Amino acid sequence: MNLKVLFLLAMVLVTLCLGEDRVTDRRQLCKCCAKLCHEDRDRTIPCSGGNSQFCEFCKRTKQKIRKDCNTQNEAKALCVGYFTGEC
């Protein structure tokens, strides 16, 4: 009985930690993508986060990028900042 409880607690902690990592990665990737789009550079340049797939958003409209990042206020702010030249 106690082992089941401990196992469930461990799973919850692991899930929370992985979730936070994903949020951080998403912010970094969004920032990278926004910068590439704003500078109109080669969009095949890999992101610093090691996940260049996210930069495929650069092939869409800037409004679409803002929409994709809308779930994370910080990421959205980074994108908008790059588009307006504030970063």
Curated annotation (Swiss-Prot):
GO cellular component terms given for this protein: extracellular region
Keyword Ion transport: no
Keywords, in A-Z order: Cleavage on pair of basic residues, Disulfide bond, Secreted, Signal, Toxin
MF annotations from Gene Ontology: toxin activity
Propeptide cleavage-removed residue intervals: 22-27
Post-translational modification: Contains 5 disulfide bonds.
Main localization of the protein described in the UniProt heading: secreted
Subcellular location: Secreted
UniProt tissue specificity: Expressed by the venom duct.
Similarity remark: Belongs to the teretoxin C (TC) superfamily.
Protein name stated in the entry: Tan_10cys
Organism listed in the record: Terebra anilis (Auger snail)
